[in-house]
């Protein structure tokens, strides 16, 4: 695992750690044809545009002041492939309904875990897990 691959992810993570426009960093982090697998109801997305338009921007629209807090970060090689992984929470005030869940108008935390395979300085294969059931419980 090169330090370039690590710094690439850390730049992406840093951009998500503050409320604002995440678009430019997402488009530079993911390869144009990246295979991005997000939990249901998002499922398989192809490329940064789909990731932004179908997952990240709607999430940001529903959670005012959304930012992401990374708690654990790991990077290394497995079977000749470079992988980066992190876990933590998306945090924001749940102000608009999202994926069928009614907005609570309260500060909400969504636990996440991500795994990204890196090639040529971009994520080409990703698995993104969100603890939506925990959010459902918080919403009643």
Give the residues covered by each predicted segment.
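C-terminal and inter-domain tail/linker signature
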Residues: 1-140
